[in-house]
Amino acid sequence: GKLLLLVEPGTPEGYGVLRGIREALLRRGAHVLAPCPHREACPLPPGEWCHFSCRIQRSRLHKMAKGGEAPYEDEKFTFLALSREPVPQRAGGRVLRHPYTGKGYVKLELCAGEGLLQKTVSKREGALYKAARKARWGDWLFF
């Protein structure tokens, strides 16, 4: 199947553009590959938007143009990957925020097939706890 990948700035406006495109293409039979794990309406409440961050190295010219000294920049973006072909629903969910790691537990905010989830994973959950500790914003966590 063909893949359509759309990327916009990680702003409310960029997210709004992709949310509208997502809704229109789903009505025409497209299938979401990422970041959403479902075909339902976005579960994020008004005022929040789905976005991710990627650290990129700055060139000398980039540093001069931005007037910055740091050798990197954290670029925020939002994206949408769609296919014409159906995709199987995966167990788990996409990590929407930086996980909070406490003593013996990890708290995560996830977008999953059943909507928005607040999940706490304890040390007693073994392999899932190890995966949750390593999970980063934007990762897929199987559970």
Model-derived features: positions:
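Charged, low-complexity, helix-prone segments enriched in Lys/Glu/Asp/Gln
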Residues: G1-K2, L18, G68
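Conserved Class I S-adenosyl-L-methionine
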Residues: V17-A41, P46-S59
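Conserved beta-strand signature within the Rossmann-like core of class I S-adenosyl-L-methionine
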Residues: G1-E13, H31-P35
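Surface-exposed, flexible loop/turn segments at secondary-structure boundaries
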Residues: P12, E40, V87
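Active-site-proximal structural scaffolding
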Residues: G14, L18-R19, E75
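C-terminal lobe and adjacent flexible extensions of AdoMet/dcAdoMet transferase-like proteins
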Residues: F52, I56-F143
